[in-house]
Amino acid sequence: MLPPPPRQPPPQARAARGAVRLQRPFLRSPLGVLRLLQLLAGAAFWITIATSKYQGPVHFALFVSVLFWLLTLGLYFLTLLGKHELVPVLGSRWLMVNVAHDVLAAALYGAATGIMSDQMQRHSYCNLKDYPLPCAYHAFLAAAVCGGVCHGLYLLSALYGCGRRCQGKQEVA
C-alpha cells in the first residue's frame, strides 16, 4: 500500500552560502578588458619564446611571462567570481594588490622586452634572404613586440588602478 501524498510540497533547497556569482560589471570594466588583453598578449609572448630555440637570459623572459600569465589568470578569475575576499590578508586590499601586481609586471616585462630585443639584435646576422640555417631572429622579434605590448598593457592597468585609488574607490570594478 502506498503512503498518502504529502500535504505540503518539500521545502526549496537554499542557495549555497558562498555561491559563485559572475561579476558582470567587471567583465565590461576597463580593468576586465585589460586583463583579457594581458592574458592574450602574455600567452603569445611565452608561446613564441617556448617554440623557439632559446638559451641564456631568454630563460628569465620565459619565467617572467609564464609567472605573470598565471598570476593574471588567478587575479582575473578571483575578481570575476567575486571570491577575492577569501584570499587571506590581501582580500581586503584587493585594489592595491592589483596595482602592485601590475607595477611589478610592467617592470619585469620591461626587462624581458629588453632581453628579447638584445637577443634579436644578436641574431640579426641570420636575417638574410638566402640564409640556409634555422634562425631565431623572427621569433625573438615577435617576442620583443609581444613583450612591449604586455609592458604597455600592465602599465595602463596600473595607472587605471592608481586612478581609482586616488578617487577613493576600494573596489576593482
From Swiss-Prot:
Widely expressed in normal tissues. Down-regulated in multiple primary tumors. The modification N-acetylmethionine is found at M1. The chain crosses the membrane at residues 30-50, 60-80, 95-115, 139-159. PROSITE patterns: MARVEL (PS51225). It is found in: Cell membrane; Cytoplasm, Cytoskeleton; Nucleus. Residues 51-59, 116-138 are extracellular. Microtubule-associated protein that exhibits cell cycle-dependent localization and can inhibit cell proliferation and migration. Down-regulated in primary multiple tumors derived from ovary, vulva, uterus, cervix, breast, testis, kidney bladder and liver. The reduced expression is owing to DNA methylation and could be reversed by pharmacologic demethylation. This is MARVEL domain-containing protein 1. It comes from Homo sapiens (Human). The lineage of its organism: Eukaryota, Metazoa, Chordata, Craniata, Vertebrata.
